[in-house]
A protein has these predicted regions:
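Active-site histidine-anchored catalytic micro-motif
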Residues: 1-479
């Protein structure tokens, strides 16, 4: 059994607007059994050419009630309220009923595995009935300004709990996670850090809408299923040795290394290939990633403490709950990590107070509002340097209780290397992925020790901070 989870802004679950063209064929269910006459030998132009007109007599085809058939919309039918599917059930049904594999057979997905469908921050919502779902709370599409919504950190906690619950079912062999192609790399990396499992987690995307010309989602899903059932990931017989992966365009990439670089099929780079998914050969691994993940991650859910220390906004600290009695992430634990992007030729010095890119203001805000917070500096590639004003303010941020990770800009290939105290070196992670790992570290280690005077910490305060930063550095070096 493969669990299929519909996540936010998933293009793979999106469709063109219905009713835009009255002649457009849309998969619909037949209301009753139907017998129709088709022209003989009209399924292929060569057959039409080779057969005489007398051999093109009508042939009767019988279609059953409830069968999906591509037909024009009935007269007067209006556009659908939402273009996204609320889950992947209908998508899988259409792919199996209306599409064929290269051998001309339908039911490609159904022949490979059985499926159970779930929703975790899905792209469409059920807005009727006694408990209508709410845009931006229960579901997250993209599109026109008034009809799009982005999930927040609370939604990420909900997603994490849901996926952990799903993989815990004994009959689930693996998970397909469906999300929007520009952002799946962040969520997938997070799931690979937090989810405690030996089962594969496969990210699935599409660059083009389902039902549209050149739609790529169907083949990506088939390749993802083939990867799961191949057991190629189970190298030592102990479970997944690869970690969360993105399967798209016939390539299996690690969640940590994959990046979207273009808005088209083939628009991902990095992360492999761990394996390739050619249709004619079995899937096998090309290399095994060495970073810790899932069942071996130092920040997986089972390794997180029940409580961690957070700042209280009054110069002291308090304990905040990370997990409830059942081991699920507590809904009220909402860490915050801001990305500071450095570019040369900014304003240096002066009385405007903007030379540090707003870091001091962000620190003041975090002290008042967020007990668990941190920063990622996206500095010069690959070493993460910025201006002295920015670095000085970020140093004070660390001694205020907010750890700071240095990263190179863009999609760095070389690691940051050794950073000056009191910063964490972000290895070769992008700023967005370093942010996800720092969020996980805040859940594992809590806030950094805060100095009485963050601009002038004592030797003892420096040692306490260094010990804390060392714990984070070990995680960043291995995950």
């Amino acid at each position: 059994m493969i669990a299929v989870v519909a996540g936010p802004t998933a293009t793979i679950l999106n469709t063109p607007p219905m009713g835009a063209d009255p002649a457009a064929l849309v998969p619909q269910r037949l209301g009753e059994d139907v017998s129709i006459e088709v022209v003989g030998h009209s399924g292929h132009p060569i057959d039409e050419h080779l057969n005489s007109a007398t051999d093109k007599a009508g042939r009767t085809v019988t279609l059953a009630r409830g069968q999906l058939v591509a037909l024009p919309l009935p007269a007067g039918a209006g556009p659908a309220e939402q273009s996204f599917f609320p889950s992947a059930e209908r998508l899988y049904e259409e792919l199996d009923a209306l599409w064929t594999d290269e051998a001309g057979r339908t039911g490609t997905l159904g022949r490979l595995a059985r499926y159970r469908h779930f929703r975790a921050g899905p792209p469409a919502g059920y807005t009727g009935g006694d408990a209508p779902e709410v845009l931006g709370v229960d579901y997250f599409p993209y599109g026109a300004w008034e009809s799009r919504a982005e999930p927040d950190i609370g939604t990420l906690m909900t997603i994490t709990n849901k996926v952990q619950e799903i993989v815990g079912a004994p009959d689930v062999a693996g998970v397909q996670w469906l999300e929007g192609s520009p952002v799946i790399e962040e969520t997938l990396y997070w799931l690979g850090l937090l989810i405690d499992t030996g089962k594969p987690i496969v990210g699935q995307v599409a660059q083009r809408l389902h039902r549209s010309i050149g739609s790529d989602g169907g083949q990506n899903l088939v390749d993802g299923v083939r990867y799961i059932v191949s057991q190629a990931w189970n190298l030592d017989g102990r479970g997944d040795a690869v970690g969360a992966v993105l399967v798209a365009d016939g390539v299996v990439r690690t969640a940590r290394g994959a990046y979207k670089v273009a808005g088209r099929p083939g628009g991902y780079a990095g992360g492999g290939p761990v394996a390739t998914c050619t249709t004619r050969w079995p899937i096998r691994l090309e290399y095994r990633p060495l970073r810790r993940h899932t069942r071996d991650s130092a920040v997986r859910i089972s390794e997180l403490p029940r409580e961690v220390r957070a700042l209280d906004g009054a110069g002291g600290s308090r304990l905040v709950q990370v997990k409830d009695s059942s081991g699920r992430l507590a809904p009220e634990v909402l860490p915050v990590v801001d990305i500071v992007v450095y570019g040369r030729y900014g304003i240096q010095g002066g009385a405007c107070g903007c030379a540090d890119l707003g870091v001091k203001d962000a620190v003041s805000h975090n002290v008042e509002r967020h007990g668990l917070a941190g920063f990622v500096l996206e500095g010069i590639a690959p070493n993460g340097w910025a201006s002295r004003a920015v670095e000085s303010s970020l140093s004070a941020a660390v001694y205020s209780g907010f750890p700071v990770v240095w990263c190179g800009r863009g999609r760095p290939e070389d690691p940051v290397g050794t950073t000056p105290a009191p910063f964490v070196a972000g290895s070769n992670l992008s700023a967005t992925k370093a942010r996800m790992l720092l969020l996980a570290c805040l859940l594992r280690f809590g806030a950094a020790p805060a100095a009485q005077d963050p601009d002038r910490p004592t030797d003892a305060e420096r040692r306490a901070t260094a010990a804390y930063i060392g714990s984070l550095q070990e995680v960043f070096d291995t995950h």
